[in-house]
């Protein structure tokens, strides 16, 4: 049994395999009837998963697909994320590749100063990474009210306008969204937080519905 060694070569032989390794500057060689290659990927170099396993796989005749990040957060271009950093909210994230809906997941979204994170984002990140690697157009769409359809949510917004008459827009989303998120959504479509709820017209209600249900981010 050899431990703490670095394998740098595996050569198929007639009756098995010849394995070359090194340890403390010294090289060695052993043979075996079978080889189990479990080197990991390249996400934990300090633990040995530094990508060298791919070279060993090639020596055995395997073909490799391009390696891209998976189970990761997504960095987004929009500056507004600095405004909502630290907010966690229930939502749905959908990734689009060249305009085609490719994958989606629902759960707790984490908004950071650089973009989006959380389990749902991890689940769809590999599709985004592959699309970016292939130089395709990639964007994500966030739905902050995934339990409601567009028509249903628009009706809710209309009813809130009636109930909250007398307040201002920065109070309109109280009880629905975190204050930071509410402010960012209003800013995104150019509605002032000091505007009276009473002045919220049909067009702006529809815009609010769209931005809450179909928040596009690159």
PLM segments and residue spans:
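A glycine-rich dinucleotide-binding beta-alpha-beta segment and adjacent secondary-structure elements
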Residues: 3-5, 183-218
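Glycine-rich nucleotide phosphate-binding loop and flanking beta-alpha elements
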Residues: 9, 25, 42-45, 118, ...
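Helix-loop-beta segment of a Rossmann-like dinucleotide-binding subdomain
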Residues: 18, 34, 38-45, 188-196
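Short beta-strand segments that buttress and anchor functional surface loops
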Residues: 19-23, 95
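Glycine-rich loop(s) and the adjacent beta-strand/alpha-helix scaffold that form part
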Residues: 34-80
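An anion/pyrophosphate-binding glycine-rich loop and adjacent beta-alpha core
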Residues: 63-66, 75-200
């Amino acid at each position: 049994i050899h431990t703490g060694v670095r394998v740098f070569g595996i050569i198929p032989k007639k009756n098995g395999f010849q394995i070359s390794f090194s340890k403390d500057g010294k090289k060695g060689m052993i043979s075996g009837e079978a080889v189990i290659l479990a080197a990991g990927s390249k996400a934990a170099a300090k633990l040995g998963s530094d990508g060298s396993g791919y070279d060993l796989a090639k020596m055995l005749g395997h073909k490799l697909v391009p390696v891209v990040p998976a189970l990761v957060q997504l960095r987004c271009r929009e500056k507004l994320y600095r405004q909502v950093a630290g907010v966690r909210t229930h939502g749905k994230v959908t990734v689009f590749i060249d305009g085609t809906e490719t994958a989606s997941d629902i759960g707790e979204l984490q908004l950071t100063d650089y973009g989006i994170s959380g389990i749902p984002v991890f689940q769809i990140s590999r599709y985004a990474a592959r699309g970016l690697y292939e130089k395709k157009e990639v964007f994500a769409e966030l739905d902050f009210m995934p339990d409601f359809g567009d028509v249903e949510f628009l009706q809710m917004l209309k009813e809130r306008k009636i109930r909250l008459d007398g307040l201002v827009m920065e109070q309109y989303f109280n009880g629905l969204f975190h204050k930071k998120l509410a402010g960012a959504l209003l800013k995104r479509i150019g509605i002032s937080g000091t505007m009276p709820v009473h002045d919220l017209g049909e067009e702006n209600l529809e815009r609010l519905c769209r931005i809450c249900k179909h928040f596009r981010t690159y």
